[in-house]
Regions:
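N-terminal subdomain of nucleotide-sugar transferases
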Residues: 1-46, 77, 105
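Active-site proximal beta-strand in glycosyltransferases
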Residues: 98-116
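Short glycine-rich, flexible loops that bind phosphorylated cofactors or substrates
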Residues: 12, 90-91, 116
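Short N-terminal targeting/anchoring amphipathic segment
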Residues: 71-91, 105-110
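Glycine-rich, highly charged phosphate/nucleotide-binding loops
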Residues: 54-74
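Hydrophobic/aromatic ligand-binding patch that stacks against planar heteroaromatic rings
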Residues: 30, 95, 99
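Short, intrinsically disordered, charge-balanced linker/junction segments flanking boundaries
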Residues: 117-121
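Conserved strand-to-helix beginnings and helix N-cap segments that scaffold or border functional pockets
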Residues: 17, 93-94
Length: 121
């Protein structure tokens, strides 16, 4: 199976070590050990941790533009599945859902975070 892999919180190619980067790399490796071909779809980082609404809107616009770029690349040889690791309110996935709708492929999420206290914004 061909899998497009994406980590909006922190790209697995980041030069800065962290648990998120390590887990992302290990998930990619586990998918590969399962016989899949895994390609990192984008290094785009959507994290905005300060609650800056202007920056969040800017990241959404940039993420949607990145989704268009990624879609252009994937349309020729689409993956069978999109896999997003660790999205949450401070690091939403602006790319995967758009690409999956366009390509009509499954959208899979690992380690999604939900904060009931943030449900109303």
């Amino acid at each position: 199976m061909n899998i497009a892999f994406y980590a909006p919180l922190k790209p697995i190619s980041s030069p800065n070590p962290s648990g998120d980067r390590l887990i992302g790399r290990l998930l990619k490796q586990a998918l590969e050990l399962g016989g899949n071909t895994v390609t990192v779809a984008s290094p785009f980082r959507s994290y905005e941790g300060k609650g800056d609404r202007g920056r969040q809107i800017q990241l959404q616009v940039e993420g949607e533009q990145e989704a268009e770029r990624v879609l252009e690349q994937l349309i020729k040889d689409p993956p069978d599945l999109w896999f997003t690791y660790h999205l949450y309110r401070k690091a939403p996935d602006w790319i995967g859902p758009m690409v999956c709708r366009a390509l009509k492929i499954p959208y899979v999420v690992s380690e999604a975070s939900f904060a009931p206290s943030q449900h109303q914004g």
